[in-house]
């Protein structure tokens, strides 16, 4: 082997690219020393990350197991088959495709399989907690299809199933989408099934945010009620960043397989699929149910404590991992609140709230989630303290003494609940 190739292949990251290595160390330090409350984020296990960083990244494997267009796929076939079988077992599904690169890719594949440009779809308004891929005008789903958006009730801030039914009867959509990115309440998938049947629509559940809760049995499953279910594999499922499609009908399964490849993707990411398999295996363990129950309990405690401190919570609470603050109650925008909590090492995101008068770049809300810190071991009492830190910072934005105290409390919490207990905090250079 030449010196050049030996150096290129065998050098570790720190010596091969010290700049990237340093930035990764800094990001790990940030994760260790900040409170992660972004609802769509979580911390993958060492095992998941090791699978994703394996030699599988070298392998091309277009097609499905035992139906590849490349040789040398015997081991990735076994890995992908294991991922499929674990996904089916985890969600009690008849079929699964583990190849989508993301939740958005999974949704696009479903659209390709079931719809034609110009067809009518129904999805929750983005400002009410929906997702870009459910028909937002800035997304391809909003450009290719005729989109009818439903919303939440202005008083309860919950889904009004009768209003949704009337809208569906009026517009006769070909596809109804349920499952959201900022909706903190339990979704009645059976009621959506009834509406879809009444108007002759396909029913898609995008359970990206609640997949882990569904897998653990702490949120009702959409699989028995929906024609197709999509999800990401991170968030509450705590796997690698990727997508997944599930269904219970063999005829649909063939369409979805073709819609993924060759319809919307080329070669699958087998290193990510291996990491998905590991995550599915973790989620099949009894400890994952305990974890998911704690996620929901922690969210309830976070919401209750923030309400007690005079901060409004959309819908008055939560049934899942999401706590959505309506900051109009304290005369603050989401943009300002995001900056204030970030300044004391709490990571969240500004978010629209139902009937928000502000633009999506400003917003009136702050979205919080409990999945990541629950992975670190945070319990109900710890989350009550997190709520107090947030409330102190938002109620006293100009008080530097309170800011310093918030920083100290965050630091103590991070020390009490280390992220990766077997890893040493990297030295920063």
Curated annotation (Swiss-Prot):
Co-factor(s): pyridoxal 5'-phosphate
Binding locations of (6S)-5,6,7,8-tetrahydrofolate: 126, 130-132, 359-361
Entry-annotated residues carrying N6-(pyridoxal phosphate)lysine: 235
This protein's record includes keyword Zinc: no
Site entry (Plays an important role in substrate specificity), positions: 234
Keyword Zinc: no
One of the GO biological process terms: tetrahydrofolate interconversion
A Gene Ontology term for the protein's cellular component: cytosol
SUPFAM superfamilies, alphabetized: PLP-dependent transferases (SSF53383)
Keywords noted in UniProt: Amino-acid biosynthesis, Cytoplasm, One-carbon metabolism, Pyridoxal phosphate, Transferase
Domain of life of the organism encoding this protein: Bacteria
Gene3D superfamilies listed in its UniProt record: Aspartate Aminotransferase, domain 1, Type I PLP-dependent aspartate aminotransferase-like (Major domain)
Catalytic activity, as annotated: (6R)-5,10-methylene-5,6,7,8-tetrahydrofolate + glycine + H2O = (6S)-5,6,7,8-tetrahydrofolate + L-serine
UniProt subunit comment: Homodimer.
The protein's name: Serine hydroxymethyltransferase
Organism: Synechococcus sp. (strain CC9902)
High-level lineage: Bacteria, Bacillati, Cyanobacteriota, Cyanophyceae, Synechococcales
